[in-house]
Regions:
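C-terminal "capping" alpha-helix adjacent to the active site of nucleotide-linked donor transferases
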Residues: 378-416
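Nucleotide-activated donor-binding/catalytic signature segment of Leloir-type glycosyltransferases, i.e.
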Residues: 281-282, 286-323
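A short, well-ordered alpha-helix in the C-terminal region of glycosyltransferases
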Residues: 402, 409, 416-430, 447
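Extended catalytic core of nucleotide-activated donor transferases of GT-like folds
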Residues: 64-72, 82-84, 102, 112-201, ...
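Conserved donor-binding/catalytic core segment of Leloir-type glycosyltransferases
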Residues: 82, 233-252, 258-262, 274-276
Length: 463
């Protein structure tokens, strides 16, 4: 079988024999040294080495040998897949769904889509991918979160899901999944998630397999917009933070970013400049009231940013303009309290920008001390509900002093910051590029096809 399928298989089940094989390798090494140093032991060591080599191979490969005896020589074609979600939405959920479609198409997987109309203010028809109309499919990949599953099910109808292998692609930011959403599992045969952090949260309560499937990170090419178009001087060093005001302001924590910048640089008129980009600021008052937040949260945020002589960008941009904004900055900052994945950070790294971020939650799948600047934190308990996030759960409180020190470090050593940015771009391209993501999705769908064709007994139980 192809190496890619094996990698996908063992990436899911995590075979324990690899740990035993490491021990065998160590013993083999000892035997080899004895062989080289003591001729009297030559024959005995040859026998020991041969036995250990066989033991190592048997420890690593029992599943592979069993599969090789049982599985067909050629892999089946990936089954036809329908991606259902807010495909035309100009937000993170829409971006994730479109990325899945692009990755599947690039991996030569038959794919179609069903666009669930988002709210009118979020709809951007020009974002719809060009694909054939929906035909009969074997797999439904529902790109909506647990909270919206029931509404989607009612909209599509029970017959749409009957007889299919139904997969949910969920994004979730907290370490615990609310009990009120457990019923959503009943529709699905498995759940895909974008990070190991979310995988741990959902797998703890899921009655079906939970597979970590990396999302595609491929932002639009930067448009023609320049710093001048954004009202940003050319001679300033720009720290940028972007967020959606409807994504729970307390979680995104823009005030934390402003506080860290103020501690690092005060209110400079030259040199460092903080730019904050926000979506849906006009809808915040009603949203805040629904969460029991004060109506003046955005007003306070605006005042805090003005106090450090920062720039607030509160209009909606198309994808190429957002990419141009990221490309125009010098460093990206996110002092979030938790993230299911952290798309804006990944996109900034895609463009080679040094990134400062809370060292907690989903972004740790792609951020390391070698490619970014991770901020220390302490876990704090939520004393009240914040939207879907329940009192008693935990999220991170980033260390503002440490964040300020890292901002100063980036500004003081531009060569080191640039080097980390280059490493970041390479890491994102290698692990979240279209080839890596498409190959992983294709491998998973091929495994599902093998199970459907009656080879389930030859596959590990945890698949």
């Amino acid at each position: 079988l192809a190496g890619g399928l094996w990698d996908g298989l063992f990436g899911v089940v995590g075979p324990e024999p690899h740990r035993f094989s490491a021990a065998a390798s160590a013993l083999f090494s000892v035997a080899a040294r004895l062989y080289a140093g003591r001729k009297a032991w030559r024959t005995a060591c040859e026998r020991v080495a041969a036995k250990l080599a066989r033991a190592r191979k048997d420890a690593v490969d029992p599943t592979r040998r069993r599969l090789a005896r049982s599985l067909p020589e050629e892999l089946p074609m990936p089954p036809s897949t329908a991606v259902i979600g807010y495909i035309s939405a100009a937000n993170g959920m829409g971006e994730a769904a479109r990325g899945t479609i692009v990755a599947l198409s690039a991996a030569q997987c038959p794919v179609h889509f069903v666009d669930i109309d988002p709210e009118p203010t979020l709809k951007a028809v020009d974002l719809l991918p060009a694909l054939p109309e929906l035909r009969k499919t074997a797999i439904n990949l529902l790109h909506v979160n647990a909270v919206n599953v029931t509404r989607c099910y009612e909209q599509m109808g029970a017959s749409f899901f009957r007889g299919k292998h139904n997969i949910g692609f969920w994004f979730w930011e907290m370490p615990t999944l609310p009990r009120r959403w457990y019923g959503a599992f009943s529709l699905f045969d498995e759940i895909w998630v974008a990070s190991r952090y979310t995988q741990a949260a959902i797998a703890a309560v899921a009655p079906v397999p939970v597979v970590c499937m990396r999302p595609l990170v491929q932002p639009a090419a930067a448009g023609s917009a320049t710093r001048k178009d954004f009202g940003i001087p050319d001679d300033r060093f720009v720290f940028l933070f972007c967020f959606d005001a409807l994504s729970i302001l307390e979680r995104k924590n823009p005030q934390g970013t402003i506080a860290a910048f103020r501690r690092a640089f005060g209110a400079p008129l030259k040199g460092p400049l903080l730019v904050v980009k926000v979506n849906n600021s006009d809808r915040v008052p009603g949203h805040e009231r629904s969460l029991g937040m004060p109506d003046d949260y955005m007003a306070d945020l605006t005042a805090s940013l003005a106090a450090v002589n920062g720039v607030l960008l509160d209009q909606r941009y198309d994808r190429s303009t957002v990419s141009a904004l990221i490309a125009a900055c010098d460093c990206y900052v996110s002092l979030h309290r938790c993230e299911g994945f952290g798309l804006t950070m990944a996109e900034a790294m895609y463009f080679g920008k040094p990134c400062i971020a809370t060292g907690y939650s989903g972004n740790l799948d792609f951020m390391t001390p070698a490619n970014s600047y991770l901020v220390g934190y302490r876990l704090t308990e939520l004393e009240r509900d914040w939207g879907p996030y329940e009192a008693g759960d935990h999220w991170a409180e980033p260390d503002i002093d440490h964040a300020a020190e890292l901002m100063q470090a980036v500004y003081a050593d531009l060569s080191l910051a640039a080097a980390r940015g280059l490493t970041a771009a390479s890491d994102i391209a290698q692990n979240y590029g279209i080839q890596a993501v498409g190959s992983a999705m294709r491998s998973r769908l091929q495994l599902l096809a093998l199970k459907k064709e009656g080879f389930g007994a030859a596959l590990p139980n945890r698949l």
